[in-house]
Swiss-Prot record:
Free-text comment on the cofactor: Binds 1 [4Fe-4S] cluster per dimer.
Family membership noted in the UniProt record: Belongs to the NifH/BchL/ChlL family.
Complex and partners: Homodimer. Protochlorophyllide reductase is composed of three subunits; ChlL, ChlN and ChlB.
Positions contributing to [4Fe-4S] cluster binding: C124, C158
Role: Component of the dark-operative protochlorophyllide reductase (DPOR) that uses Mg-ATP and reduced ferredoxin to reduce ring D of protochlorophyllide (Pchlide) to form chlorophyllide a (Chlide). This reaction is light-independent. The L component serves as a unique electron donor to the NB-component of the complex, and binds Mg-ATP.
GO biological process, one term: light-independent chlorophyll biosynthetic process
NCBIfam families named among the record's database cross-references: DPOR_bchL (TIGR01281)
Organism from which the protein derives: Prochlorococcus marinus (strain MIT 9215)
The protein, known as: Light-independent protochlorophyllide reductase iron-sulfur ATP-binding protein
Pfam family, one: Fer4_NifH
Positions with a binding annotation for ATP: G39, I40, G41, K42, S43, T44, K68, N209, R210
Organism lineage string: Bacteria, Bacillati, Cyanobacteriota, Cyanophyceae, Synechococcales
Name of the gene this protein is made from: chlL
Length: 295
C-alpha cells in the first residue's frame, strides 16, 4: 500500500508564524529586512542606512527585532522602551496607547521602534514582530512612510524570526570576509529562497562589513548568484560612532568618515533606484567548506 505525502504549506507542520493577511505594510513603501551572523554589525548597518535614506529626503521607519532592543540607540541616542514592554503595561489593550508611547524620533527624523521579544526560552519573536506591525497599522503610522527597515536578530532563520521576510521587498545580508559569516549567510539565502515561494521578498544583495578584502565573499557570490551592494572596511570611525551613541553622519567629517558616509548614501540610492532582485542558490554545507579558503 502506498500513500502520497503532500508538501506542507508555508507555516504548516512547524512552529513558523503564518502571516495574518490583514497585517501588511502599504504598497509603495520600500521594505528591507537586514540579516546576518550575530555580532556582524547589522544594527550599525541598519541605523546608518536609515540615516542615509533620511539624508535623501525619505521618511524612514526602523524596526528593531531583537529582545536586546539595541537596534536604534545610535539614532535616538538612548535605549527606548520596547513594544512588548509597553503592551504589557496596558495588559495588551493597544487601543490605550498613543504613538509616542512606542515610536521615537531619531536622527534627521528617522522614526524608531523596538519590538523587543519574549523572555529567553519562551514565546516567539515572530509573533512580537507581527504585533508591532499590527500596532503601527492601527495607528496609521505606515501610511506616509517611504522606507521601512527591519533589523533582525542574529542569523536565526526559524519561522519566528523569518517573519520580517513576509513583509519585506528585499533582504540585505551583512557579512564579513570570513568562513563563519559566509556560512551563516548561506543559511539565510536558503530561508529567503523558501519564503520567496509564497511572499514578495527577494534578495537585494550583500553588504560586506568590517573587511579589508572581499575575495571570499566574491567566491560565494559567484557560485550562488549574489551581488555585493556595499563594502565597508574595518574603519575605526564606525566603532567610535557606536561608542558615541550616534550615526556615522554625526561624526566629525574626516576623510574616513566621509568615505563611509558616501558608501551608505550610494547603497541607499541603489536600493531606491537600481536594485536588481537576485535568485540566490544556496550551497550545501560541504560545498561551502570546499569553496572557501586559500588555494
Amino acid at each position: 500500500m502506498t500513500s502520497t505525502i503532500n508538501k506542507p504549506l508555508d507555516g504548516e507542520g512547524s512552529v513558523q508564524v503564518k502571516q495574518d493577511p490583514k497585517i501588511n505594510i502599504e504598497e509603495g513603501a520600500l521594505v528591507i529586512a537586514v540579516y546576518g551572523k550575530g555580532g556582524i554589525g547589522k544594527s550599525t548597518t541598519s541605523s546608518n542606512l536609515s540615516a542615509a535614506f533620511s539624508k535623501l529626503g525619505k521618511k524612514v521607519l526602523q524596526i528593531g527585532c531583537d529582545p536586546k532592543h539595541d537596534s536604534t540607540f545610535t539614532l535616538t541616542h538612548k535605549m527606548v522602551p520596547t513594544v512588548i514592554d509597553i503592551l504589557e503595561e496596558v495588559d495588551f489593550h493597544s487601543e490605550e496607547l498613543r504613538p509616542n508611547d512606542f515610536m521615537f524620533e531619531g536622527f534627521n527624523g528617522v522614526m524608531c521602534v523596538e519590538s523587543g521579544g519574549p523572555p529567553a526560552g519562551t514565546g516567539c519573536g515572530g509573533y512580537v514582530t507581527g504585533q508591532t506591525v499590527k500596532l503601527l497599522k492601527e495607528h496609521h503610522l505606515l501610511e506616509d512612510t517611504d522606507v521601512v527597515i527591519f533589523d533582525v536578530l542574529g542569523d536565526v532563520v526559524c519561522g519566528g524570526f523569518a517573519a520580517p521576510l513576509q513583509h519585506a521587498n528585499y533582504c540585505l545580508i551583512v557579512t564579513a570576509n570570513d568562513f563563519d559569516s559566509i556560512f551563516a549567510m548561506n543559511r539565510i539565502v536558503s530561508a529567503i529562497k523558501a519564503k520567496a515561494k509564497n511572499y514578495k521578498v527577494r534578495l537585494g544583495g550583500v553588504v560586506a562589513n568590517r573587511s579589508k578584502d572581499t575575495d571570499q565573499i566574491d567566491k560565494f557570490n559567484e557560485r550562488t548568484g549574489l551581488k555585493t551592494m556595499a563594502h565597508f572596511k574595518d574603519v575605526d570611525a564606525i566603532r567610535r560612532s557606536r561608542l558615541k551613541k550616534c550615526t556615522i553622519f554625526e561624526m566629525e567629517p574626516t576623510e574616513d568618515v566621509i568615505e563611509v558616509q558616501n558608501e551608505y548614501l550610494s547603497l541607499a540610492k541603489n536600493m531606491l533606484e537600481n536594485v536588481e532582485p537576485l535568485e540566490g542558490n544556496p550551497l550545501k554545507d560541504r560545498e561551502i567548506f570546499d569553496l572557501l579558503g586559500f588555494d
